[in-house]
Amino acid sequence: MHDIRQIRDNPEAFDAALARRGHEPVAAEILALDEQCRAVTTKMQEAQSRRNEASKAIGQAMGQGNTEKAEALKAEVADLKQTLPRLEDEDRELKMRLENALAVIPNLPLDDVPDGADESDNIEVGTWGTKREFSFEPREHADIGPALGMDFETGARLSGARFTFLRGGMARLHRALGQFMLDRQVSEYGYAECAPPVLVRDEAMYGTDKLPKFAEDSFQTTDGRWLIPTAEVSLTASVMDQILDDAALPMRLTALTPCFRSEAGAAGKDTRGFIRQHQFEKCELVSIVRPENSAAEHERMTEAAESVLQALDLPYRKMLLCTGDMGFGARKTYDLEVWLPGQGAYREISSCSNTGDFQARRMNARYRPEGEKKTAFVHTLNGSGLAVGRTLVAVIENYQEEDGSVAVPEVLAPYMGGAMKLEPTP
């Protein structure tokens, strides 16, 4: 959500920032609605004030024996009581229209975000690791996986397209990866482990900018709750409508949860394999910080996500997203893309975003700076540390052997009960 004062103070700069994201100008429309809203609010407040004054004056007139004046004041109060409900309704409606108009405007990019139209304009800002040289032609995970317990047929039979049933060693490796990620973020980077609900109300989805813009990308239950598309929703919204102590910041939260996405906009993409699923697990990172610390926290969070890939010895590149490829609520985003030798391509495995106070305004999350009476909005950040399913894919493709087996990364040995290889079944 945007600060209306920012638009009032410099509408041209606001529209110019939106134009960098390929968005049409909206300042004039927003300010016209804002002017209507303020005019009606003023009118309503004046009517309320006059009603109170006139009501008080009735008693004074009666005490002075001025019946005629008292009757006139009573008539005025009666008129105001009829007028006020209409003004109050109009005030509520205009405020709702203004909020709805602001709610669908994306966040403004920071100055150091490159301009661009789509992912082809993203900038590579770093790489890590050495791509393995194979003595055989590496295969894709969708070809290797079935013999190792990645059962696409049963998943589809049970639930339809984009669902997978993991068995045996494959299921254990998937679990090991998630536990390793969670343990690392807690022990190495000081994130507090959480186990949040995966069903949330509208308010949590709205506060984390998933509604109303992306309703079709999420699953809703019959009672109106939403299955979380990411634990970002539950973790970030945990401070909704709160005023935090300055000493409580930074607040770093992590959770390993199932996530659910309808993938409405992904028709025809990654229809094969385990890359794009309706249900998947992810180790989510959320930071809630003072405004002056959000830029440094963004770098720290991205480093935390990178550390998992480095520990697993998975080659990757770090991309700074351009204005045209950033998510709706982000003002700056880094994507980590892991190398998949079977596909011969880098694929996104983590996205770390700084949203500034964009989400905090939507969910009214504030803190009280030490020694000050006034509160201020916090800044929120979120990132994947990492997507478990895609990491499983990366391990399969990077650690595959010619016989169809897959070696287990050394750091996962404590989680695998000593099993250091997945062997194909005949």
UniProtKB/Swiss-Prot annotation:
PROSITE patterns to which the protein is assigned, alphabetical = AA_TRNA_LIGASE_II
- GO CC: one term? cytoplasm
Catalytic reaction equation(s): tRNA(Ser) + L-serine + ATP = L-seryl-tRNA(Ser) + AMP + diphosphate + H(+); tRNA(Sec) + L-serine + ATP = L-seryl-tRNA(Sec) + AMP + diphosphate + H(+)
Q: Name one GO biological process term.
A: selenocysteine biosynthetic process
Q: What is its EC number?
A: 6.1.1.11
* Keywords attached to this entry: Aminoacyl-tRNA synthetase, ATP-binding, Cytoplasm, Ligase, Nucleotide-binding, Protein biosynthesis
One Pfam annotation reads tRNA-synt_2b
Q: Where is the protein localized?
A: Cytoplasm
Similarity remark: Belongs to the class-II aminoacyl-tRNA synthetase family. Type-1 seryl-tRNA synthetase subfamily.
The Swiss-Prot or TrEMBL note on domains reads: Consists of two distinct domains, a catalytic core and a N-terminal extension that is involved in tRNA binding.
Q: Which HAMAP family match?
A: Ser_tRNA_synth_type1 (MF_00176)
Q: What does this protein do?
A: Catalyzes the attachment of serine to tRNA(Ser). Is also able to aminoacylate tRNA(Sec) with serine, to form the misacylated tRNA L-seryl-tRNA(Sec), which will be further converted into selenocysteinyl-tRNA(Sec).
What protein does this entry describe?
Answer: Serine--tRNA ligase
Organism whose genome encodes this protein = Erythrobacter litoralis (strain HTCC2594)
Q: What high-level taxonomic lineage is stated for the organism?
A: Bacteria, Pseudomonadati, Pseudomonadota, Alphaproteobacteria, Sphingomonadales
